[in-house]
Amino acid sequence: MAESSESLSASSPARQRRRISDPLTSSPGRSSRRADALTSSPGRDLPPFEDESEGLLGTEGPMEEEEDGEELIGDGMERDYRPIPELDVYEAEGLALDDEDVEELTASQREAAERTMRQRDREAGRGLGRMRRGLLYDSSEEDEERPARKRRHVERATEDGEEDEEMIESIENLEDLKGHSVREWVSMAGPRLEIHHRFKNFLRTHVDSHGHNVFKERISDMCKENRESLVVNYEDLAAREHVLAYFLPEAPAELLQIFDEAALEVVLAMYPKYDRITNHIHVRISHLPLVEELRSLRQLHLNQLIRTSGVVTSCTGVLPQLSMVKYNCSKCNFVLGPFCQSQNQEVKPGSCPECQSAGPFEINMEETIYQNYQRIRIQESPGKVAAGRLPRSKDAILLADLVDSCKPGDEIELTGIYHNNYDGSLNTANGFPVFATIILANHVAKKDNKVAVGELTDEDVKMITGLSKDQQIGEKIFASIAPSIYGHEDIKRGLALALFGGEPKNPGGKHKVRGDINVLLCGDPGTAKSQFLKYIEKVSSRAIFTTGQGASAVGLTAYVQRHPVSREWTLEAGALVLADRGVCLIDEFDKMNDQDRTSIHEAMEQQSISISKAGIVTSLQARCTVIAAANPIGGRYDPSLTFSENVDLTEPIISRFDVLCVVRDTVDPVQDEMLARFVVGSHVRHHPSNKKDEGLTNGGTLEPAMPNTYGVEPLPQEVLKKYIIYAKERVRPKLNQMDQDKVARMYSDLRKESMATGSIPITVRHIESMIRMAEAHARMHLRDYVMEDDVNMAIRVMMESFIDTQKFSVMRSMRKTFARYLSFRRDNNDLLLFILKQLVAEQVTYQRNRFGAQQDTIEIPEKDLMDKARQINIHNLSAFYDSDLFKFNKFSRDLKRKLILQQF
């Protein structure tokens, strides 16, 4: 019996092992039932690292095992107690004996061991289907294995029971908010972790249409430049992760915080040491589909992601803002913190945990972390403000690396979170609680003409290129400028060239030469000068209209004022800065005082404005075309005086204008009658009750071609606007094939005549003006090179501008001297009509002086007209006599007496 008891005790380990293992492996049916019993047992909720065998074999388990398992007590039970030497010995491997010294683990060794144990227990638990991802341990570890683990877990979940279907729902049905709001849902741990994983996977795997990894290249470029902003296209996010794109505008603050954390992990996975440069990566959202106007922002936009546009009118300096703040207890010098400072409220400690005192507390300047802070104000773009409305403005906050991304005068697109904050001054002013609103910027993009070109469709581009191949496109564009204004072809030609503009040059980044063409209109009252400016304001993509009487020097350039809240000096942009890359229109230019007028000298030539006030020394861009209108001294233009004697402007300001247009109100019975008919017909045609021609007033062909115009059909105004935008952005004409000798000869001739007549001074600026106008004429035809025709047109415009500013006594002789330049692209009939009108005017003056009255019929001998025509190389007048131009001006021929008659 002693031997049997010894053998029983010696074989007890083997017996215990067999009792556990044999029933589970006896048959496949039993194993499946046993697995069900295991997964549903109370041991599922036991804490880790405990002996789980007690939970697996509970009180109910053995009862089922005795019914279904093998019979252990019987005739063959002695076999269970037979000695098996290899199984009757405990394993000694890995066990430390009592007499052995065990070395104490270091911190790194202990951490590695615990990581291995956690990995083992996690795999063991998942193998049994007992635990879900992220519940036992922090699932933020081993990020490199997560995508693969996630796929394996989803595959296992499809094969397991109802318990694991809940896990699939939490991953696949993230859009099911379960009755919560979006902001509450994304703040929970489960959805927050899933959003983190999805966005991280999006950054790692998103490819473009060519198969290139988009964000790998962007992150590489970002790290090369040591930046901390990663731009994500909202359209790409919506295409891949539509749930995240749905959550983002509703809860932007929470989502962007998760995105920033995920982006930082992706960046550190690619560049592990990038945290030495920055500890934060900011995800910037671009191309948000819906663009809101500043005046349309309402309370429903609060705390949502919005996209708006406007012009920056003022900006503060870059200030340090508290990010992570630490406090010193003044009584015990204990350091409290760090406290994360948010934009909405100030965080202050209540009591000191060391001495239990309630303060006072001082900010620890050395250990506190700051971030960059800048406040800007954006205003609605001038072209988007409805008539009679004041432009709205809104403040925006730029943080981190967004500071100094724009300056006053820039037109920007701003994506950010629309916040409200408490403002005590508003409560005092209104008498009841209201909140001020502000935009916390997330992404800032400068707008230029490329955005305008991007709005053109393929059909528009095809139509524009087709129009450029028309031989008469130049005349059509000239005729399309202000078609509701009668006559003034030279002014329309100059304004058309100014709208297209030349090409700016900056050789080596040292000296910048402007490409914009400045135009000055001067003449008698009632000659449509202001109407021309108003027309340019409508047809230009970006225009600022101001008057000389109401504009001061700082109103035109820029000024410095103290911010009412922060009490610091801020820079405010004036009209010329706001019109950057556009047109600045100044009416009543002569009403400005000299001090205000000299302030725009730099803006008109160097196209920049230097500010040195209140400690702010800077330079702002003013790359705009200046078109001004002025009245002569005394109200009417005196042709017996030169231009500079008629206008109260100094020579430096006159020489900065490329084109000078003199508008004179001369008495001509025929022209006056035609003008009156034109005006009356225009009023009748555009009356609101006239429904028949309603379509023409909305951008169609406004007026029929008049005989004194270019004789071609004008372009619709919308087509003209698109044509100008396309030409200014896509065409860059070069001067390779330009006739330089012709320009040099003409410049020397102009200098001689200028010195002899004492009229406006001719300077080197006029050579640059001719080059700019030649480039503008080439751009008008969408040509890449300046041709001889472009140079001839520029010389003709320059000559007409120069001759119109002369005294009447020298104007005729000068026209004869420069006739070869003035005759370019002019129809012979136009030249002959001009000569014939001069002969009629001389005859009218003769009759008034001799008879004291004017006769109803003026007779001009054909021989006089023939002699004048031969001087400009025109020998055949039959085509002129048969033309409509001859008949429309009420001329007729008496063939017997060989006279030309005009009836008044």
From Swiss-Prot:
Where is the stretch described as Disordered?
1-166
What PROSITE patterns does the record tag this protein with?
Answer: MCM_1, MCM_2
The answer to whether the entry has keyword Chloroplast is no
Gene3D superfamilies named in the record:
2.20.28.10, mini-chromosome maintenance (MCM) complex, chain A, domain 1, Nucleic acid-binding proteins, P-loop containing nucleotide triphosphate hydrolases
Region of interest: Interaction with DNJC9: 61-130
- Lineage from the top down? Eukaryota, Metazoa, Chordata, Craniata, Vertebrata
- Name-wise, this protein is DNA replication licensing factor MCM2
Where it mainly occurs, coarsely classed, is nucleus
Residues bearing Phosphoserine are: 12, 21, 26-27, 32, 40-41, 53, 108, 139-140, 381, 484
Q: Where is this cross-link: Glycyl lysine isopeptide (Lys-Gly) (interchain with G-Cter in SUMO2)?
A: 178
Compartments (UniProt record): Nucleus; Chromosome
Please, which domain of life does this record's source organism belong to? Eukaryota
Biased-composition ranges, Low complexity, are 1-12
Question: Which InterPro entries would you find in this protein's record?
Answer: MCM (IPR031327), MCM2 (IPR008045), MCM_CS (IPR018525), MCM_dom (IPR001208), MCM_lid (IPR041562), MCM_N (IPR027925), MCM_OB (IPR033762), NA-bd_OB-fold (IPR012340)
- For this chain the motif Arginine finger maps to 655-658
Quote the catalytic activity from the record.
ATP + H2O = ADP + phosphate + H(+)
Specify the residue ranges making up the C4-type zinc fingers.
329-355
Q: Which residues carry this modification: N-acetylalanine?
A: 2
Q: Name one GO biological process term.
A: cochlea development
E.C. numbers = 3.6.4.12
Q: Which family does it belong to?
A: Belongs to the MCM family.
